[in-house]
Amino acid sequence: MHSSTHDDLVILGGTFDPIHYGHLRAVEEVRQALAIAQAMLIPAGHPPHRKSPWADARHRLAMTRIAVAHHPQFTVSSWEVEREGPSYTVDTLTALRQQRPDAVLAMVIGMDAFLRFDTWHHWQHILDLTHLVVTGRPGWPAAELPEALRQALYQRRCEDVDALRQTPAGCILFHTVTALEISASNIRSLLAGHQSPRFLLPDEVLDYIDAEGLYQSP
């Protein structure tokens, strides 16, 4: 079994527009299941796979930091926010792997994102840099997956956490987390309609949103 190190890391990237309890609970449950001490949240600066975020990168980074300020097991990276150009996951993971050559890296990804994973920039190389922890059980016929992704799943799927921890990277693990039906788009809609999204995200984040006047209807 791969020996555990203090550099082992669970990773969650996203626009976090805004960050909410769905993000935080998923990464915390994966962190505990993998018995990894640290998790890193990485707000995207210029996400290449979706339209521009509603809040600018400075605000999204600030909200992410506020959300985990009192939780020392979480760190927040500003790499993608500070970097010029598109926020390609493979570039961020390459930098992380250079810093932590022997560590177990486990990137959390939702089922919807996994079904489009073969469209990501250099997606196959990503699997050489990190494990993928897909937060959901596969509920589709494998034949419906794109051929390249189906082959990757066949070659790299891990059945359990112990199998994943044998190596620093390269496994795809499906892991069920608490299903919190929270979406950033719904939170934005509530705010634009002058309704409160309290209890969907940390109070401190909501206070920041109110103070900065974010997500208000035009």
Swiss-Prot record:
EC number: 2.7.7.18
Catalytic activity of the protein: nicotinate beta-D-ribonucleotide + ATP + H(+) = deamido-NAD(+) + diphosphate
GO biological process assignments: NAD biosynthetic process
Claim: Lipid biosynthesis is one of the keywords in the record: no
EC primary class: transferase
Pathway noted in the entry: Cofactor biosynthesis; NAD(+) biosynthesis; deamido-NAD(+) from nicotinate D-ribonucleotide: step 1/1
Cross-referenced CDD domains: NMNAT
Keyword Nucleotide-binding: yes
Record InterPro entries: Cyt_trans-like, NadD/NMNAT, Rossmann-like_a/b/a_fold
Family to which this protein belongs: Belongs to the NadD family.
Role description: Catalyzes the reversible adenylation of nicotinate mononucleotide (NaMN) to nicotinic acid adenine dinucleotide (NaAD).
Protein name: Probable nicotinate-nucleotide adenylyltransferase
